[in-house]
Every structure is written in structure tokens, then in C-alpha cells.
Curated annotation (Swiss-Prot):
Glyoxylate binds at Y25, Y130, R165, H255, R258. Keywords: Flavoprotein, FMN, Glycolate pathway, Oxidoreductase, Peroxisome, Photorespiration. The keyword Ubl conjugation does not apply. Its EC number is 1.1.3.15. GO terms for cellular component: peroxisome. It comes from Oryza sativa subsp. japonica. It catalyses: glycolate + O2 = glyoxylate + H2O2. PROSITE patterns: FMN_HYDROXY_ACID_DH_1, FMN_HYDROXY_ACID_DH_2. Belongs to the FMN-dependent alpha-hydroxy acid dehydrogenase family. The gene is GLO3. GO terms for biological process: oxidative photosynthetic carbon pathway; photorespiration; regulation of photosynthesis; response to other organism; symbiont entry into host cell. This is Glycolate oxidase 3. The lineage of its organism: Eukaryota, Viridiplantae, Streptophyta, Embryophyta, Tracheophyta.
Length: 367
């Protein structure tokens, strides 16, 4: 195999390797996929203001997330059904995250159970949660995550209904017959019904609670002592409500551009959320991160860290655990280089003054 020199190269290799239905499920966005492209392109419009003649012989990328020390501000986002990409699926991802000294977030809709992932490797892990119509299912899932040593809940709040993913409709996407949503196997909810469009869309419509509201965020705090990250915040208004609801943190996310098309890129929403958060809780970002330079830009705009999704899936498909390890190492190396060339020796030294955004350029043009 030709030497892989950046994260994005894994996607083309994964496209060649995976069945079309599975590649399309991982790669596609909602409707026209404008937001899918914008998640990447918005990063390219942010430029650097590097500082020079600073001793960068030693660089420290370590950080703390919700009280847990990790090696770098790059973590793994929840991505469903990873055994479609590789036979070891989430177990390989967990081992790679552990080796890198960072956090993995396990999807509710994983093809490995919370118990299996806990046994795969030591490490700090978060559990992503959808709220089901049957709240007893939610209680059981949260309890199992607690017993399996998970350290936080990432509550997905942008999916009262599944976005219109036309590739999945064309492919009549369904979980391959040899796989099951392991966390739901004992509840007889581990399989999706065959339909004329997307099996996942039908599953969400039948199981996920459309009435989910901010009162449920408070309810969740009554059934667990784990900190709750609200995943899917994109506005100041919802940031204010997240703070008021007692959330421990926010993940600025548009669900990988898979829900509502024509929403802004997450990097374009980040500053609005950070400004409203006012340091009362940490703000994280996912969506479109493919380079260490992207990580630096997010940190400069106020993020406490980033989560990556598709790069993990594509590298997992190509080379299993070793692929995920390589993606994490490449992003780490690129971030370290960006810090050195920008004159930063620690994450605390990365400031808003290190980047120029579209809004900066507009402001300057009016002066």
C-alpha cells in the first residue's frame, strides 16, 4: 500500500474497500450535502497569524477534559455500527484511543456492547445516548455504562427525527444480517426492519423520542451522577439553555452534516457558542476536522478540544486498529507542528489572535 501521508487519504482507500451501502452510510450527508462540504471548506477560510522567534523546542499538548487528563485535545466522536467497517469495530477503536491516551465516545448504536468495549482496553470513555420513548431503556443503558466504567454521557439532542440521507434511501440501508446493535440485543431492539427506504430512519421513527426537551436533560441528571455533555448545540440561545439545564459541557455539532442541511459549519458556529458560554462550561467541536491545523483553529476560537468521526471509520476500514492509531498520531503530529510554527508551546498559549476569520476580514474592511 502506498504511504499514507494525511488523514483524508484514508477515505478514498475506504471507498475502494467497503461495500457501496456501507461506504455511503458513513460518508454521506443530508439532502444536497451542502453542509457536508461546508464543514470542511469553512476551515479553509480561517487563516493564521503566526508569531516568530519563540522557543518551541518543547511543546506540551496535554489537556484536561471534565477532570480527566488526556494526551492531546483530539478525541473520538461516537460513530455507529463500526463492525460494518472492520470485524473488530469499536474494540479496535477503543484500543487505539487507549494507546493514544485520549477519550473514545461509544455510540449507543454500536456493534460492540459497553461491557465488551470496557474489556477491550483501559482508558477514559464517554457514552453517547439517544433518549428512547421507553425511558426504562434509557435507565438500563445509563446504568450499564456506569457499571462499565464510562465517565460521561454525551446526549445527542439534534435527532428528534433522522435527517433525509438520500444515499441510504437509494441503497435501502440496513444493518448487515450478521451484525446487531449490541447494547439492545437483550431488549430485542438490536435489529432493524427491512423497509423500502432506510432501515435506520424507520428504527429512529419507531424508537427515539421526538418529545425530547430541556426538561429531559434535567431528568437525566436524576438517574445518573455522570457529567452530561449536550451534543448538537449551534446557537447562543441553546447554549444559554444548556448552562441553565446543568450540562457539564457542550459539543458544537451538526451531526456530521447528516441531519438538517444548510446549517452552518460547526467551526462557523463555535465563537457564538463560546461567547455565550462565558467560561461556565467547556465547549467542544466536531465536524470537518481533517488536519492538525483544523484542531489549532478550533482551539484558537475557544474550543476546549475536538472530536473526530469519519477519519476513524475510514482508517478502521482500511487498516483496523493500526489505521485508527495512525490517524490519531498524524493529527497529533500536525497539531504539534502547527503550534511550533505559530509560536505556541502549550494549548494555553493558543489565542484568538492566532487566527483571522471571515468576520475579522469584514470588520477590517469597514474601518
Amino acid at each position: 500500500m502506498e504511504l499514507i501521508t494525511n488523514v483524508s487519504e484514508y477515505e478514498q482507500l475506504a471507498k475502494q474497500k467497503l461495500p457501496k451501502m456501507i461506504y455511503d452510510y458513513y460518508a454521506s450527508g443530508a439532502e444536497d450535502q451542502w453542509t457536508l462540504k461546508e464543514n470542511r471548506e469553512a476551515f479553509s477560510r480561517i487563516l493564521f497569524r503566526p508569531r516568530i522567534l519563540i522557543d518551541v523546542s518543547r511543546i506540551n499538548m496535554a489537556t484536561n477534559v471534565l477532570g480527566f487528563n488526556i494526551s492531546m485535545p483530539i478525541m473520538i466522536a461516537p460513530s455507529a455500527m463500526q463492525k460494518m467497517a472492520h470485524p473488530e469495530g469499536e474494540l479496535a477503536t477503543a484500543r487505539a484511543a487507549s494507546a493514544a491516551g485520549t477519550i473514545m465516545t461509544l455510540s449507543s448504536w454500536s456493534t460492540s456492547s459497553v461491557e465488551e468495549v470496557n474489556s477491550a482496553a483501559p482508558g477514559i470513555r464517554f457514552f453517547q445516548l439517544y433518549v428512547y420513548k421507553d425511558r426504562n431503556i434509557v435507565r438500563q443503558l445509563v446504568r450499564r455504562a456506569e457499571l462499565a466504567g464510562f465517565k460521561a454521557i454525551a446526549l445527542t439532542v439534534d435527532t428528534p427525527r433522522l435527517g433525509r440521507r438520500e444515499a441510504d434511501i437509494k441503497n435501502r440501508f440496513n444493518l448487515p444480517p450478521h451484525l446487531v446493535l449490541k447494547n439492545f440485543e437483550a431488549l430485542d431492539l438490536g435489529k432493524m426492519d427491512k423497509t423500502n427506504d432506510s432501515g435506520l430512519a424507520s428504527y429512529v421513527a419507531s424508537q427515539v423520542d421526538r418529545s425530547l426537551s430541556w426538561t429531559d436533560v434535567k431528568w437525566l441528571q436524576t438517574i445518573t451522577s455522570l457529567p452530561i455533555l449536550v451534543k448538537g448545540v449551534m446557537t447562543a440561545e441553546d447554549t444559554r439553555l444548556a448552562v441553565e439545564s446543568g450540562a457539564a459541557g457542550i459539543i458544537v455539532s451538526n451531526h456530521g452534516a447528516r441531519q438538517l442541511d444548510y446549517v452552518p459549519a460547526t467551526i462557523s458556529c463555535l465563537e457564538e457558542v463560546v461567547r455565550e458560554a462565558k467560561g461556565r462550561l467547556p465547549v467542544f467541536l466536531d465536524g470537518g476536522v481533517r488536519r492538525g491545523t483544523d484542531v489549532f483553529k478550533a482551539l484558537a476560537l475557544g474550543a476546549s478540544g475536538v472530536f473526530i468521526g469519519r477519519p476513524v471509520l475510514f482508517s478502521l476500514a482500511v487498516d483496523g486498529e493500526a489505521g485508527v492509531r495512525k490517524v490519531l498520531q498524524m493529527l497529533r503530529d500536525e497539531l504539534e507542528l502547527t503550534m511550533a510554527l505559530s509560536g505556541c508551546t502549550s494549548l494555553a498559549e493558543i489565542t484568538r489572535n492566532h487566527v483571522i476569520t471571515d468576520s475579522d476580514r469584514i470588520r477590517r474592511s469597514r474601518l
